[in-house]
Amino acid sequence: MLNISEYRDLISLFGEFSEKELSPKRLEIDKGGEAFKGAINKLEELGVFDEEINSIPLPVKIKIIMEFSRGEAGIAQFVAKSWTVGNLGIARSEKLVQFPSERVYYNGKLAEFKGENVDVLGLRSCPWALGEIRVLGDYGNFDKEILFYDIACLVGISEAALESAENYAKERKAFDRTIYDFEEIRGFIQRGRSYVEGIKGALLVSEDPMKLLNLALEMAYFCTDKAMQIFGGYSFINEYPVQKFLRDARMLRSLLIRKLW
């Protein structure tokens, strides 16, 4: 049985990077461009894209993706893509491609892609394009691994949303006390954390991510929605990251929910 603690130092290294380099800059990175490229370059220096990473067990990789997505989900998505399909883009539907390139991965197939870049609701730091896909032939099937990483991203986004909401609630005062002192507010956060811990634990031992997908989508919806409620009117101000968590979670939901149909 895998002992994840054997990889504690590696997970901590990437977790510390996420906390110090991604979280404080997440709104800037969300705009893409140089901030996104700069973060990727630093990860390259840390060895995230070295061939040795391929030998790391999947549950450890899942933990690392969780850590990165707590900082900035688009960065986590890029790392996950690199660990699965390398330099290929990922076709998320028959027309929508994430990290577009001339060759894309499409449901276990290698495909040719031509399209135009588009702006999207969430995961804005990732480039996206709409266009035409032409299947060229079979390719190694990475659908299952990609889904594991997508759910890991939902976990990280949910954790970040709850953390931001809790920190805000402990500072924001109403009726001469912090709003964290109100039972309902604490209940939102505690319930969200129970969802997160349940999905996180199951994800690390599961052999089939599809069995967790519906619960993971519900978890992310609850955590990001309640975080928005806790921030109140401030949740709609771009200076706070809580709206980004909601957008990123909704974007992943729109990409993944069709798998449940």
For each predicted feature, which ranges?
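Short, flexible active-site-proximal loops enriched in glycine and acidic residues
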Residues: 71-81
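FAD-binding core of flavoproteins
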Residues: 2, 75-77, 87-167
